[in-house]
Amino acid sequence: MAWTSLILSLLALCSGASSQAVVTQESALTTSPGGTVILTCRSSTGAVTTSNYANWVQEKPDHLFTGLIGGTSNRAPGVPVRFSGSLIGDKAALTITGAQTEDDAMYFCALWYSTHF
């Protein structure tokens, strides 16, 4: 069996009424099939909380987008259990436990910010 590395590229998105927040993630992470990787998402406005409703989206090389996690930790229907969302410290996190070669993709984090009038 040939072992290959998975390169997980990350981009960050920000949605909501506040245009001043900056969301940052690692630029790339690598693991081997069967490995565990934790991708994190940080906000410039402070700690990420459940009120930010962190969402994680996967983009495959053929530009197919799949919503993985919504509302910080809710796995979308049909998403394998190896994907999980959580908060770690002041960041949102996507954990891939037992990574598979088909997980080689871009991963996007989106946070919700609302402004009260």
UniProtKB/Swiss-Prot annotation:
Q: Where is the signal peptide?
A: 1-19
Q: Where is the Ig-like domain?
A: 20-117
| Positions bearing Pyrrolidone carboxylic acid | 20
Superkingdom field: Eukaryota
Alphabetized, the UniProt keywords read: Adaptive immunity, Immunity, Immunoglobulin, Pyrrolidone carboxylic acid, Signal
Cellular component, GO annotation: immunoglobulin complex
Its GO biological process annotations read: adaptive immune response; immune response
The record ties this protein, via InterPro entries, to: Ig-like_dom, Ig-like_dom_sf, Ig-like_fold, Ig_V-set, IgV_Light_Chain
This protein is called Immunoglobulin lambda variable 2
For this protein's source organism, the top of the classification is: Eukaryota, Metazoa, Chordata, Craniata, Vertebrata
